[in-house]
Amino acid sequence: MKGEWTAAAYAALYDRVVDGFPPYEHLVDSVAGLIERLNLKDRRPAPCRILDVTCGTGSVVRRLAARGHVVVGADPIVPLVERARRANRRGSSCCFYAIDVAHQEVPEIESFDAVVSMHTLYWHPEPARVLNACRRALRPGGHAIVLTYSRPAAVVPVARAVWQAEGMRAALQSLRWLIPTAAFELARGGPHLYLPPAELARLLCEHGLEPLGSDAVFLGGISQLTWSRRLPCSTSPETRRESSLPRQR
């Protein structure tokens, strides 16, 4: 019951936080541009077919669809998916499923040019299964774009880092994200998994994804954006040891 209440409250607040929030909009545009460049490099026809594995209220899905791509959003939290569906315009090239990709198969596996995971691994109780799902959803040679926190989004340290890098105005602006995120994390509880670049690259390799590049991004570099390619594997990644994942904390 507490989890449902927290999710419903988060759904009501989330869009107000991200809509018109320049750092987040810049981040999503960067992800979209990266997908388009990778697809062009592979000489694949436009538009791209994209899966967002934990789409939340669908803000990323809608922005990608607005650029002309065909996008599927999946999320295990029903109130978030319901809000995403209500916000979706008729005729839009996107759709939403209330499923947990760690346990339920995404429609049309091995058909997506790109899979997007936005801040999923640090909170999901089974991150290894999420990475396996990303690989299964991709066409051969398709790309996984994984964004995850490399350190906690602590209000004071992150705002201070933004101030030092970008000035007072940007630091004050960052509070729009940091304060609601801190409140949500306090209400949600549970373990967290923060992955430095080398650790994330290792996990991607272990689950059939070849890292191609990585950048520290978003609010003073608290997040790691890594892009990778689906590897052909003679051994199914699902058979690999999931115990190699570091403990969430």
Give the predicted meaning of each segment.
Residues 1-45, 59, 145-173, 180-184, 218:
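Conserved class I S-adenosyl-L-methionine
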Residues 128-140:
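A short glycine-rich, Lys/Arg-flanked "PGG" loop and its adjoining helix->strand segment in the class I
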Residues 191-207:
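Short alpha-helix
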